[in-house]
Amino acid sequence: MVKILKTTLRATTMLKVLVKIRLSLFLTFSVLCLMPIMYMASHKTIPNEFLHNFGGKIPKSIKLETRSGLTFDVQVTKNSGRVVLQSGWASYVSAHDLKIGDFLVFKYSGDSQLKTLIFDSSGCEKVCEKPVDMSGRSYDIAMRNSQDEKKKRKQRDISRQGTVKPSEEGLKAELVPGCILPSRTDLTRLQKNILIEKVKAINSETPIYGYVMNNSSIHGIPCTVEISKKYADVYLPFEDGTVVLQHHGKSWNVRCCLTKQNSKRFLKGWRQFAGDNKLHLGDICLFDLLKDKKKYVMDVHIIRRK
């Protein structure tokens, strides 16, 4: 505990300088909220002194916006008279690799939105990985996964990752630019070529999530589609919510929730979508997240297995 307090004190001292030098553009007439990370938890309490920014009306959810423009929807609850950031906070922590001794700077920018800056214990700012160029276009990608997380993904059952049985010409999924697929997904050369052309034709502003239909997603009880942690942490930053799937002018409400492995799954509503669109084993669904500030909406493109 003494070590933690010393680390926090050092970070606080550094921030006094940073507030004067590096945060000059961040400061307006709004009050900043400075919060040290002294222990890791699935929630974060907002200091009472900061709550007056909300005008006495505490919203049920707020958006946390990072310097790189990514936003995270976080549910707000009351616990023992304190206002707490709860559902969705864990995704924010994971995506930014927060550690004990890090320091958060929150600025209320109106409309239930907080702009955030993150500093490590040395006072250096931590920023989400910036967009990188993939086949001539820029995409926001998730923070790098730790080596431990990579090992866990390798140990997962292939059948739960939406894979097609490997063949002699199997190709790794990450070779498809602009498309995130579950780890260890193997594609035939024909599937890869079709997928590349389809992703280019969609021309999405954000990475597309692809999933190959397997027994769990067609005949499973429950019938599910798993969304990889790499994609879900950044683009579906909530623990339990509804995603609207659109295909050929129709829409389906599908429940999306967190799993024990910290990935996410489509559950209630997915079986109806799969049945209505006559999905079969080996079909590939491409989920294109649309920009909608009020809800999560995805256009679904289907590549039939021939």
Curated annotation (Swiss-Prot):
It comes from the Eukaryota. Its main location: nucleus. It is found in: Nucleus. GO terms for molecular function: DNA binding. CDD domains: B3_DNA. Keywords: DNA-binding, Nucleus, Repeat, Transcription, Transcription regulation. Residues 139-166 are annotated as: Disordered. The keyword Lipid biosynthesis does not apply. This is Putative B3 domain-containing protein Os03g0621600. The keyword DNA-binding applies. Residues 29-122, 210-306 bind DNA. GO terms for cellular component: nucleus.
